Amino acid sequence: MEPSKGQERSLIKVRIELDPSMDEPEILIRAPRLTQELSQLQESILKQKLVPLAFYKDRSEYFLDLADILFFETDGEKIYGHTKDEAYEVKQKLYELEELLPIAFCRISKSTIVNAKQIYSLEKSFSGTSTVNFYQTHKQVHVSRRYYQVLKERLNEMR
């Protein structure tokens, strides 16, 4: 399928060069100009962490794939990461999670961060609060008016 008029077709060449003299990997992006796509790529790379996020339930510690996390939310003083079937406690604060999580995760209220890749639908209500529904679960969260537009933009970027 050819891009429509006004749409740029973005091609990115990826090359890995091994250099045993280096202490740590380095990523260099060369481009004729800075685009939104390159800025997002840079942000995504910078957010990648080698340290896995630990989740806790009862006396067990779990290392879950972030792709399985629907959302993080506060409940009193605790923060929970929700999968479609379970809720696990995490030790980080929401603002710390915002720094650690990949670009697919987006703040939608004072108490919730959502995984945009897991969103099935977004229902807007007359009261101004919208509801997020997820794939294959009954769990829902609410988007505050303040964060609604940010979420819509993130969802459009992820398409």
Across the structure, where does each feature detected by a protein language model lie?
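N-terminal regulatory/sensing modules of transcriptional regulators
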Residues: 1-39
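Conserved binding/recognition cores within well-folded domains
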Residues: 5, 37-136, 140
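Short coil/turn motifs at secondary-structure junctions
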Residues: 137, 148-150
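C-terminal structural segments of small proteins and small subunits
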Residues: 142-143, 149
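Intrinsically disordered, low-complexity N-terminal regions enriched in serine/proline/glycine
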Residues: 55, 146-147
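Charged phosphate-binding loop/patch that engages nucleotide di/tri-phosphates or the phosphate backbone
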Residues: 4, 150-159
